[in-house]
């Protein structure tokens, strides 16, 4: 019987490094539809072709604006525009800390603002997430599940999903937030100890997506609670989530006051810890 490991080593060598070392400079496939790019010079006055065909009403005219919180990243607008003014790039960096920042218009850049120094002190090195699927199609949930695989390995940043909301620091909401999930969503959020964060993952969670006009939605939770981070997409790419969350947690705040005590930077040596010995019985 031939040994399996020579073939396994050959395959491993051909595949290369599976983990993405730097999520800020990672590249996505050319076919990936990321942040749209608008050439405003090619958009004629009075043309509303893209507005009329958008299935979620994410595009508005005068001035031309694309709402990434409602966009499902379908190619209909790019195929319909007679001047080719709209095109998708493979840029996955689209997370934002306010709903208004998801409005893509001329002269606007999308970038998460820094969290408060207290949030960074508490969660900068360890952030536990509780996922709540509030009426999703499982597309977003599949991408959230991929965050823990060998490629993205979100755990190396101290960020991971856990089962109990009582041990969580934030909830990640995917899906449209239906009436059937309204009570469960509220109860889960109440179980998370303070301070806590809310992250909306995907177009359905942010705006209702293609189901925004359904009478089965219950958006009261989104309207009455402050959302800390928006992750657009349908579904969002795992890199969009990781990059947006790291930008939110690790961006530098303005210079601290004299004598202020700040959390020191994480030393790489801290990750090379030796396992503890088992205590005697």
What is each residue range found by the language model?
Residues 1-6, 10-17, 23, 79-165, ...:
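Flanking helices and flexible, charged tails adjoining ferredoxin-like Fe-S electron-transfer domains
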Residues 1-53, 57, 111:
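Ferredoxin-type iron-sulfur electron-transfer modules and their immediate structural context
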Residues 33-35, 126, 169:
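A common structural microfeature
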Residues 38, 47-94:
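Iron-sulfur cluster-binding cysteine motifs and their immediate structural context
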Residues 40-41, 68, 89-91, 107, ...:
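Fold-independent oxyanion-binding glycine-rich loops
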Residues 55, 121-124, 142, 149, ...:
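Generic secondary-structure signature for well-ordered alpha-helical cores
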Residues 142-144, 149-152, 156-243:
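Cofactor-cradling patches in redox/metallo enzymes
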Residues 213-281:
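C-terminal functional extensions of proteins
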């Amino acid at each position: 019987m031939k040994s399996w490991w020579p073939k396994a080593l050959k395959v491993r060598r051909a595949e290369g490094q599976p983990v993405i070392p730097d999520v800020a400079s990672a590249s996505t496939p050319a076919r990936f539809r990321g942040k749209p790019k608008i050439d405003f010079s090619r958009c004629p006055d009075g043309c509303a072709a893209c507005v009329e065909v958008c299935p979620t009403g994410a595009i508005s005219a005068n001035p031309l604006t694309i709402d990434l919180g409602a966009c499902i990243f379908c190619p209909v607008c790019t195929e319909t525009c007679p001047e080719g003014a709209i095109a998708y790039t493979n840029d996955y960096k689209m997370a934002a800390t306010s709903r208004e920042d998801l409005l893509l218009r001329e002269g606007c850049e999308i970038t998460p603002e820094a969290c408060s120094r207290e949030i960074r002190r508490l969660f900068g090195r360890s952030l536990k997430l509780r996922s709540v699927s509030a009426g999703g199609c499982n597309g977003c949930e599949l991408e959230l599940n991929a965050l823990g695989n060998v490629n993205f390995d979100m755990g190396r940043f101290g960020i991971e999903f856990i089962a109990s909301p009582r041990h969580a620091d934030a909830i990640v909401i995917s899906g449209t937030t239906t009436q059937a999930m309204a009570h469960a969503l509220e109860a889960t959020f109440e179980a998370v100890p303070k301070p806590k964060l809310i992250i909306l993952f995907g177009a359905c969670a942010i705006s209702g997506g293609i189901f925004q006009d359904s009478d089965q939605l219950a958006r009261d939770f989104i309207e009455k609670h402050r959302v800390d981070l928006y992750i657009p997409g349908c579904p969002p790419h795992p890199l969009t989530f990781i990059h947006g969350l790291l930008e939110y947690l690790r961006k530098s705040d303005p210079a601290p006051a004299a004598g202020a005590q700040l959390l020191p930077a994480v030393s790489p040596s801290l990750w090379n810890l030796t396992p503890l010995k088992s205590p005697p019985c």
